[in-house]
Curated annotation (Swiss-Prot):
Name of the featured protein: Metacaspase-1
GO terms of molecular function: cysteine-type endopeptidase activity
Enzyme class label: hydrolase
EC number(s) from the headed UniProt entry: 3.4.22.-
Function, in words: Involved in cell death (apoptosis).
Taxonomic path: Eukaryota, Fungi, Dikarya, Basidiomycota, Ustilaginomycotina
Chain residue ranges for the region called Disordered: 1-79
Listed Gene3D superfamilies: 3.40.50.12660
Keyword Hydrolase in annotation: yes
One cellular component term from this protein's GO annotations in UniProt: cytoplasm
Residue positions of the active site: H193, C249
A Gene Ontology biological process term: proteolysis
Keyword Protease: yes
Length: 402
């Protein structure tokens, strides 16, 4: 199979990496399901500059609630209509400004990239990320994805090309989208640490880019959402599907997709009015206390925040919309952490577990039902709220397929 880094264009990053150029492997095989993680970091491999585990945890902190006993749902998830077989009719595309978008027919080739990082030997070590990858890999096998068309990067492997360093990760992302055609079905799954970095382009309402954190992040840097979008979304043709799942902290807008959906199926609007209301109330209290300067500063800050938030949303819609059919499920909002949990005695990411539980029980759900069901599974144990976003407006009553 074509392999990450073999030929083709490579996105150049300011953080280094993104190249590749290593040859296709001989006898490449994925570990079996009876694997046991090594007691420490894999031995005998080197990443750029000679990788050694850092002494401090990755930025963004350790995913919360580690070791929490998270049992599978005891009964059916959601209302009875979730078990209804939906007809996946041929949906029509539309226009975003002057750009045409199309839903994928899902009849073309299938490719998947699965990344799980436990950060063995680091202070921020996680336990469930590699398990997440194995579980998602099995899920995809049952849905027509072949092992020869799946690349797995985990930090329990001995082959240097299969270690989730920054260079290997970005090269694998290029492999995923290389040669994509209308009707193709691509799948990306990341389970690991997530973080935030100061934004400079004015496209983030909170002023921060969301990041994912490679194994060698201290030497090679984090991977920001702008770069993820540039590699995996921008090159896709009209009508090509990319389904992405990010089970990591601060992952709400990890692909910088412009349309984020509520559980009722509507596009979310930034909560500007609520923020403005609170700011005006504070200014009024300052006025009542005779603090005219405080009142003026409060009003200026309030309306600046409102302007920046709506401005960031407009920039995102103008620069991040795509004719491709890109859908992302993230484990939490940008401001939240995503839990590393325990399910039936095995470590797993809470979001990955919830998604697989829902999809295995109800293979035919609409987008709206899927989002609600995943949230329902998590709601009784965690505060994190999974987010669903897309590159173009989607009909949330359509059948969700991968």
């Amino acid at each position: 199979m074509a392999y990450p880094g073999q030929g083709g264009h490579h996105y150049q990053s300011t953080h280094g990496g993104g190249g590749g150029g290593f040859p296709a492997p001989h006898g490449y095989a994925q570990p079996g399901y009876g694997y046991a993680p090594p007691s420490g970091p894999p031995q005998g491999y080197q990443s750029g500059g000679g990788y050694a585990p850092p002494m401090q945890p990755p930025p963004g902190g350790v995913q919360g609630q580690m070791g929490y006993g998270f049992a599978p749902p005891s009964g059916p998830i959601g209302p009875p209509e979730y078990a209804t077989n939906h007809v996946n009719y041929n949906p029509q595309g539309g226009m975003i400004g002057n750009q045409r978008y199309e839903y994928s027919s899902m009849q073309g080739k299938r490719k998947a990239l699965l990344i799980g990082i436990n950060y063995f030997g680091q202070n921020g070590e996680l336990r469930g990320c590699i398990n997440d990858v194995r579980n998602v890999q099995n899920f995809l096998r049952q849905r027509g994805y072949k092992d020869d068309d799946m690349v797995v990067l985990t930090d329990d492997q001995r082959d240097a090309r299969s270690i989730p360093t920054r260079q290997n990760m970005t090269a694998a992302m290029h492999w995923l989208v290389r040669g994509a055609q209308p009707g193709d079905a691509l799948f990306f799954h990341y389970s690991g640490h997530g973080g935030q970095a100061k934004a400079t382009q004015g496209d983030e309402a909170d002023g921060y880019n969301e990041t994912i954190i490679p194994l060698d992040y201290q030497q090679a840097g984090q991977i920001e959402d702008d770069e993820l979008h540039a590699i995996m979304v921008r090159p896709l043709p009209v009508g090509c599907r990319l389904t992405a799942i990010f089970d990591s902290c601060h992952s709400g807008t990890a692909l910088d997709l412009p349309y984020v959906y509520t559980t009722s199926g509507n596009v979310k609007e930034p909560n500007v009015i609520a923020g403005v209301g609170k700011g005006i109330m504070g200014a009024a209290m300052n006025y009542a206390r005779g603090d005219v300067l405080g009142m003026a500063k409060g009003l200026f800050s309030t309306f600046t925040t409102a302007k920046n938030t709506s401005g960031a949303e407009e920039v995102t819609k103008q620069t991040r919309s795509s004719g491709a059919d890109v859908v992302m499920l993230s484990g939490c909002k940008d401001s939240q952490t995503s839990a590393d949990a325990t399910e039936a005695g095995k470590a797993t990411g809470a979001c990955s577990f919830a998604f697989l539980s829902v999809m295995n029980q109800y293979p035919q759900l609409t987008y709206k039902q899927m989002l609600n069901a995943v949230r329902d599974v998590l709601a009784s144990k965690y505060s994190q709220k999974p987010q669903l976003s897309s590159s173009h407006p989607i009909d949330m009553d359509l059948l969700f397929v991968v």
